[in-house]
Each structure stands twice: as C-alpha cells, then as structure tokens.
C-alpha cells in the first residue's frame, strides 16, 4: 500500500519558508518582491490560476499586479506592455498566462520577457542556460515535482526514473532535473515501444501524458514513487494519468489528482521570484 503524498502540505511548508524570508526583509526595511501577471482574454483556467496566485502572494507578503488585455489585441501592443514591465525596476517577475489566443505568436511574445524576470522559465535564454547547467529560472511544474519527490525522504541518486512525456514545460525539464540529482533517466513518448516494461524497472515514474488512467498496476515496480502530472476529465471526474486506486496498492508513494503536483506549482513560481533577492 502506498503513502499518498499531500501536495497541499508540501506547498504549505514551502510557503511558510517564503513568508519567513519576506518577513525578514520587511523587518530590515528592504524591498519586497513584486510580480506582474499578464492575461490576454478571459480564459477560465487562467482566471482561476490568477485568483489562486493572488491569494498565495497575499499570504506570503508579495505584491501582485494583474494586467488584463483584450483577446483581439495586436501583438505589438502586447510586446509594448512586456517591454514596459521589463524596464520597471519595481517589477521583479513577469508571468504571461497561458494559453495565449491562437492568433498570436506565443514563442515570439514569450521571448520578449526579460530573462531575469522570466520566473516561469519559459524564454529560450533561460532554457539554454538550464540545459547548460547555468543559474536560471526553471519551469515551475518540473521544480515542484522534484520538491515532492524529496518530501518522501527517499534518495533520488542512483535510482532508475522513467518520465512519460517530453514537453518543454514538464517532461524534458523534469528529466534533466532528475539527471542533475544523479538518477538514470528514460524518457518515453508516443513512439516508445513497450512502455510497460520500461516502467516496471523504474524506482520513480513521472507521468505527464494527459491520457487518463494510462499507467496501470502492472506497470509498477513494488515500492516505486509515482508522480502524476496528468489532468483529464473522465465521466465528470478529474483524473490523472495514473489508475490511482489500483496503482495505490503497489506503489510506495503516489500523488493524487487533484491535490498533488498542481498544489505545489504556484508556490514554486513564488519561490523563483524570491530567488531574485537571494
């Protein structure tokens, strides 16, 4: 039987540390971080995320600003807003809410964010620095996954890890972070043959495929750490990539959906912001 990893608890512990850091700065009369969010249109998921981000910032003591732009805004106007924020010395982090409207060039717009304010770690410059092993901002979900694995107190070093999915935001960066922790990592994707046999050898499985209940009990090695990044709606219920109830019987540790990785990601964003001042 697995231990369910409580992402909310991991997030709360991180937020306490960050609040202590901000409280110390306030006591010393030092500048408090400010993050500016840009929302284009009115995507419901983004609106929920912004509400949650604002709450976390308020709890920690960080200034949060939200800029809302019309969905049909011209690309040049968005870039102008970003460049103004780049120049603003009182803004220390910029979040561009995804997804952008399909009419916009996402890569072009993202790369207008100053790398030193790109706390989401999405710009090409931060990506290049990350894979070269240089100091930079790292995508928050990938960072959160490592934080969750470490919360189990199990060593990552020397372990076999399988990452299901190769996205630039989750799959690839979490694989690199696991390598940095001295794990031996295999990345699986839609063209990988016999994913099950690869998973059965893994001490750590991170699934970010977006296929509901793809990972079954017979994929799992006894005692494995299973991290579910997937998010789907099945029969009106929110589910992940892992067949949770059955995998729970065999894994050592497992994250639920909801209440797992998604609870930690927003806090990692604020941790990145605070790193600017360290």
Curated annotation (Swiss-Prot):
PROSITE patterns: THF_DHG_CYH_1. NADP(+) binds at residues 165-167, 190. One of its GO terms (molecular function) is methenyltetrahydrofolate cyclohydrolase activity. It catalyses: (6R)-5,10-methylene-5,6,7,8-tetrahydrofolate + NADP(+) = (6R)-5,10-methenyltetrahydrofolate + NADPH; (6R)-5,10-methenyltetrahydrofolate + H2O = (6R)-10-formyltetrahydrofolate + H(+). One of its GO terms (biological process) is purine nucleotide biosynthetic process. Pfam families: THF_DHG_CYH, THF_DHG_CYH_C. Pathway: One-carbon metabolism; tetrahydrofolate interconversion. The keyword Secreted does not apply. GO terms for cellular component: cytosol. Keywords: Amino-acid biosynthesis, Histidine biosynthesis, Hydrolase, Methionine biosynthesis, Multifunctional enzyme, NADP, One-carbon metabolism, Oxidoreductase, Purine biosynthesis. Its EC number is 1.5.1.5, 3.5.4.9. Signal peptide: none annotated. CDD domains: NAD_bind_m-THF_DH_Cyclohyd (cd01080). Belongs to the tetrahydrofolate dehydrogenase/cyclohydrolase family. Homodimer. This is Bifunctional protein FolD. It comes from Clostridium tetani (strain Massachusetts / E88). The gene is folD.
């Amino acid at each position: 039987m697995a231990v369910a990893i409580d992402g909310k608890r991991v997030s709360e512990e991180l937020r306490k540390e960050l609040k202590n850091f901000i409280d110390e700065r306030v006591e010393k009369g030092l500048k408090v971080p400010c993050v500016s969010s840009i929302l284009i249109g009115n995507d419901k998921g983004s609106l929920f995320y912004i509400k949650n981000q604002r709450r976390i910032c308020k709890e920690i003591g960080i200034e949060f600003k939200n800029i809302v732009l019309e969905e049909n805004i011209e690309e040049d106007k968005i870039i102008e807003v970003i460049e103004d924020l780049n120049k603003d010395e009182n803004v220390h982090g910029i979040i561009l809410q995804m997804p952008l409207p399909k009419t916009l060039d996402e890569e072009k717009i993202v790369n207008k964010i100053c790398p030193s304010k790109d706390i989401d770690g999405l710009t090409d410059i931060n990506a290049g620095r990350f894979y070269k092993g240089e100091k930079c901002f790292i995508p928050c979900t990938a960072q959160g996954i490592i934080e969750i694995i470490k919360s189990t107190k199990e060593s990552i070093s020397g372990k076999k890890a399988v990452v299901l999915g190769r996205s630039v935001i989750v799959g690839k960066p979490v694989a690199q972070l696991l390598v940095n922790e001295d794990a031996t990592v295999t990345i699986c994707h839609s063209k990988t043959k016999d994913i099950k046999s690869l998973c059965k050898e893994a001490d750590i499985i991170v699934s970010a495929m977006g296929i509901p209940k793809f990972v079954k009990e017979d994929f799992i090695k006894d005692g494995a750490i299973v991290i579910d990044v997937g998010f789907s709606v099945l029969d009106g219920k929110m589910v992940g990539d892992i067949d949770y109830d059955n995998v729970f019987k065999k894994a050592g540790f497992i994250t639920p959906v909801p209440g797992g990785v998604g609870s930690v990601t927003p806090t990692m964003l604020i941790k990145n912001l605070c790193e600017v001042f360290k």
